[in-house]
Regions:
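Phosphate/diphosphate ligand-binding glycine-rich loop within oxidoreductases
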Residues: 38-141, 268
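Glycine-rich phosphate/diphosphate-binding loop of Rossmann-like nucleotide-binding domains
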Residues: 48-61, 144-222
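Phosphate-coordination loops involved in phosphoryl transfer and adenosine-cofactor binding
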Residues: 37-43, 148-150, 257
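Short, structured coil segments at secondary-structure junctions
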Residues: 65, 115-116, 172, 254-256, ...
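Positively charged, low-complexity intrinsically disordered leader regions
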Residues: 1-56, 60
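C-terminal helix-to-coil terminal segments
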Residues: 278-308
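Rossmann-like adenosine-cofactor binding region
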Residues: 195-274
Length: 308
């Protein structure tokens, strides 16, 4: 994966289809312990949003690669007192080998990347969540043996996960459908990018009809109805999103061998029922584990880890 050495990952659109497949192949090798890589570098985590899976998986991945991790809580850095992002970026560039940022605005992430010479990884913004989708695609590939030609349906809020799924599925040669209530559509710019990548070779469908979107799909995916920072809207969103719940009834419209994904945390009884998330078609826990393997592959590729 020499092509990714020293590069940022701010969006899945930063990858080519070949680079995506190579990342997933490396993740599979690392997961099966067929390859022992070491990089001995220092990763900084600058997270302005709460995190369980992203924080822990990045930390464990870096330790397993022989590196070190510094957790940079913005609340105890000068960022919280108004230090300009560009100044912080240029200072961290002198201390760290790579930086993963979890923040609200995509623009803040891009400013860090513009001013820091070290690689910057998008660990979640309001616009995209590329590392999550790497794990999602790895999980789908493990379940079906391939990605090309499969149909993934996302049901719910057109949020950062939906945006990155549009890009990731298009890059992987998958059909992607997003079902959402009126007014909660994915980002228009991301949709245009996904359609350009798909180039009419695969389906990119946006609809307000969850049943239409689910029909014969091999993967059914959902996320919370109110993302971080939208907690005040949660109660008002409940009746709007109720028809977009992944239930056994909706799942019955999908391919009989369909799998169910959720990036977690889940609000059982809202976007997904208890029966579905705990059912035989759920791959949610494999999906969560694969955050570790996908991000380890990403770190190893960007840092140019050596085999031992």
């Amino acid at each position: 994966m020499t092509a990714l050495i020293g590069r940022d990952l701010l969006s899945l659109a930063d990858l080519s289809p070949t680079e995506l497949q190579e990342l997933l192949a490396l993740a599979t090798q690392l997961k099966s312990q067929q390859l022992n890589l070491r990089c001995h570098k220092v990763l900084g985590l600058l997270f302005s949003k709460a995190s369980t899976r992203t924080r822990v998986s990045f930390t464990v991945a870096m330790y397993q690669l022989g590196g070190q991790v510094i957790d940079l809580n913005p609340n105890v850095t000068q960022v919280s007192r108004g230090e300009p992002v560009q100044d912080t970026a240029r200072v961290l560039d002198r201390y760290l080998d790579i930086l993963a940022i979890r923040t609200f605005a995509q623009q803040e992430l891009e400013t860090f990347a513009n001013y820091a010479k070290i690689p910057v990884i998008n660990a979640l913004t309001d616009l995209e969540h590329p590392c999550q989708i790497l794990a999602d695609l790895l999980t789908v590939q493990e379940s079906f043996g391939t990605l090309a030609g499969l149909t993934l349906t996302y049901v719910g809020d057109g949020n950062n996960v939906a945006n990155s799924l549009l890009l990731g599925c298009a890059l992987a040669g998958m059909n992607v459908r997003v079902a959402f209530p009126v007014g909660y559509e994915p980002d228009a710019g991301i949709v245009a990018q996904a359609k350009a990548i798909a180039n009419n070779q695969t389906e990119v469908l946006l609809t307000n009809d969850p049943e239409l979107a689910t029909k014969d799909a091999q993967v059914l995916y959902t996320d919370v109805w109110a993302s971080m920072g939208q907690e005040a809207e949660a109660d008002n969103r409940l009746p709007i999103f109720q028809p977009y719940q992944i239930s056994e009834q909706l799942l019955s419209l999908a391919d009989p061998k369909a799998i169910v994904l959720h990036c977690l945390p889940a609000h059982r009884g809202e976007e997904i029922t208890e029966e579905v998330i705990e059912g035989s078609q759920s791959r949610v826990w494999d999906q969560a584990e694969n955050r570790l393997h996908a991000q380890k592959a990403l770190l190893a590729s960007i840092l140019g880890a050596d085999s031992e």
